[in-house]
Design a protein with these regions (language model features):
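Anaerobic metallocofactor- and corrinoid-dependent redox/one-carbon enzyme cores
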Residues: 2-173
Length: 173
């Protein structure tokens, strides 16, 4: 997969996604590739009534790098990763300390990785679903606590793409 543009097969009629694709197509000029560094919170949820994570996930699956929090260096890193790997990439906050209890419960015996060879990666949900084992939709817990604490169920904080990264070779940079 190389970064590409104009790919429309399989898109839903989601207005936000189509608007982003149309806007980029109309404004890319002579450029061949496009990337987005979006301000995904906190104003997005209150204005549009959902989080954009799952749409960002879909865009990264099309070869269009997307970073959150207007992370210009992050989206540049994703773009380089797509060019080098030919596959969707993700941008995660990495914690190299996996608690032994989590390792014992969720990792040990399921693969050959030792505790010292594991890490935890987190982000709200812009990772392409093709990179996830059992991907599913969720909601952004931190935003829910801040923007809708009185609601028993999430409303405007729904839309994250969640799941564990599939086992396999990875590259960090």
């Amino acid at each position: 997969m190389k970064p590409r543009w104009g790919f429309r097969t399989g898109l839903t009629d989601d207005g936000y996604e189509l608007t982003l694709l149309d806007w980029a197509e109309q404004h890319k000029g002579t450029r061949e590739y496009v990337a987005f560094a979006a301000k995904c919170w906190p104003a997005f949820q209150t204005e549009f009534k959902f989080v954009p994570c799952y749409i960002n996930s879909r865009l990264t699956g099309m070869g269009i790098p997307v970073s959150c929090e207007v992370d210009i260096y992050g989206v540049l890193s994703e773009y380089i990763g797509v060019c080098v790997s030919g596959a969707p990439v993700t941008l995660l906050d990495i914690n190299n300390t996996v608690p032994k209890s989590i390792y014992d419960k969720s990792i040990c015996g399921k693969c050959s990785a030792k505790l010292t060879e594991t890490f935890m990666g987190f982000h709200c949900g812009n990772t392409c679903s093709k990179l996830l084992k059992d991907p599913h939709m969720g909601y952004q817990l931190i935003m829910k606590r801040d923007l809708e604490p009185e609601l028993p169920e999430p409303d405007i904080t729904r839309g994250t793409m969640e799941g564990n990264i599939k086992p396999g070779d990875i590259t960090f940079f």
